[in-house]
């Protein structure tokens, strides 16, 4: 059995930064709260809980120190934290913070802002709060008509398109192309800001390449992780035997044994030890 591990598998910079800095904080103090999951990975969440991090769903449950997770938070969350007298430990991924600044800049310039992303994802929920009232989230091409109708009704002649950092590059390009075609005769100035981060893009590209060369493609990561699910979608288009797992316990050993070439890719919030555990199990089957 040949096992090929993707070079881009595992923690991205933003996740590694958030996890490492959280652990540093916990060495000195235990009464630290995190609003929502720091990153979308069950193993990481459990590890941080064991070290003393307290995860909450409502900021009113916190006292003293509050961590802002890697996905970022809505503008009003910061205001509320200050009103409550909380010490903010901001671990928002720098790539996400950059998008917030871009959104504020274009909102001040009077642009209508389209944010392409998963509507319920924490990053998208946070980013749209920086976009002002003249904005719309597009998750799929079915949302385009409504977004553009709002644009035309607003009588704004300037449009900028942004993206969630972990969105599918292929879907982003498809949506941008459809929007561009629709507004080409509408006298609207269009600016496209592909804010999908490089780590996401490279991971998606490598997954596409690797999944076309193997008999089985294993994607490791949280099932509610946006970037991990995108990798799984990409893998399935190239390899029928693509599977998404959170840990090595989920592998069907008897099924895996039947194949000669196994590819492995992991999401941006998947810890190294989860990847190593899968590899170790596969090696025992060789």
Language model segments and positions:
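The feature marks the mature, well-folded catalytic cores of soluble enzymes
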Residues: 1-286
